[in-house]
């Protein structure tokens, strides 16, 4: 006597439902785990400039120990949660200033410190300009500028900072 076991339709239906629930649960867990909070950053006036897009696509995923996360506006980026570094492309290019200007990897940055110690570093001589805001007590400006200068250099330089020594000769 031979016995043939046929799977019951109810059993297959239960297995299918269980598999669907397991797959859906795994998908949701993975999706939620990989979601970083969105940083609210206002877009700069010239954020739609095509030169910003060329720079934005080559921004690094990490600065120091801070990972890049999504932002709420075009041509913006943020690293860290809470944000340690915030970048906006399309800000107004700075004119002549007495604020210090540093050159990092052939990109000039004008540095401005506010009363609370937060620094705003803006590319000089590039249009559109790129603005980076950071707290140097949380992440070193040297790390930030060294990491971002390659991306910022995608917007061609039209001017350079003038050193104090060169300015005194005029």
Positions of the model-derived regions?
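Short, charged/polar surface micro-motifs in flexible loops or helix N-caps
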Residues: 91-98
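Bacterial signal peptide processing site
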Residues: 36-39
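Secreted/processed peptides and extracellular or luminal domains of membrane proteins
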Residues: 41, 58-59, 95, 107, ...
């Amino acid at each position: 006597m031979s016995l043939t076991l046929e799977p019951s339709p109810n059993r297959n239906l239960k297995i299918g439902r269980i598999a669907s629930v397991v797959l859906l649960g795994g998908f949701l867990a993975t999706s939620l785990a990989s979601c970083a909070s969105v940083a609210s950053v206002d877009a700069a006036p010239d954020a739609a400039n095509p030169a910003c897009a060329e720079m934005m696509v080559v921004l690094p995923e990490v600065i120091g120990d801070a990972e890049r996360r999504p932002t709420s506006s075009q041509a913006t980026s943020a690293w860290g949660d809470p944000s340690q570094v915030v970048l906006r492309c399309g800000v107004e290019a700075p004119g002549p200033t007495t604020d210090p200007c540093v050159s990092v990897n052939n990109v000039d940055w004008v540095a401005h410190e506010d009363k609370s110690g937060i620094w705003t570093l803006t590319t000089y001589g590039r249009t559109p300009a790129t603005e980076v805001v950071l707290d140097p007590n949380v992440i070193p400006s040297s790390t930030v500028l060294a990491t971002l200068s390659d991306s910022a250099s995608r917007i061609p330089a039209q001017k350079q900072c003038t050193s104090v020594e060169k300015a005194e000769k005029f």
